[in-house]
Amino acid sequence: MYSGGLDSLGMIYKLLTDPEYKDYKLHIHHIHNRNVEHRDRAEAIVVPMVLKELEQLGFSFVYSESEIGSQPYNGQFMYDTDSINFFAGYICSVNPRIVKVAMGMQANDANHSLEERRIRANKIFTAFTDVEKIFPVLEMTKREIYDSLPESLRNMFWSCRVPVYTKESIQPCGKCKTCLQLKDAGIR
């Protein structure tokens, strides 16, 4: 499952280059998740750029995408962990050739609220399928993921949770959790 962020980009690159995964065919799926964060517009720019670059690097894969839109209720909104697991489970339930689903979770993705969301998301996923989830970059930091990418891919990701849009550009907010993690890692 490909969000457009650094972790999932690193996951895809590892799946395409690590000999451990050489016997698998890669199906990349991206979800245009329209919610209060408004990341979908920024991701819609970077995702096709990455796919084109991966093809230019000689990699082959299948690509598909889904769309979901949700408004906030009682100050809460649907997290990407829920929609990713919904679509991953659904796709596995209708495509028996899929034997593993890769998620871009990495070493610094840990806190109590994230764990509660992961438990809920896993229930959503397993309602559809018993396909195994794998986490190829789980033991890597953001810096290690970034450094593992070829130069041509290193800045083709969108990780900011709340982009700042103007008529001329889209900029990272510089304040959300992922922006701060990238800054701390010396990436942006």
Segment roles from a protein language model:
Residues 1-188:
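Nucleotide-activated chemistry modules centered on ATP-dependent adenylation/adenylyltransferase
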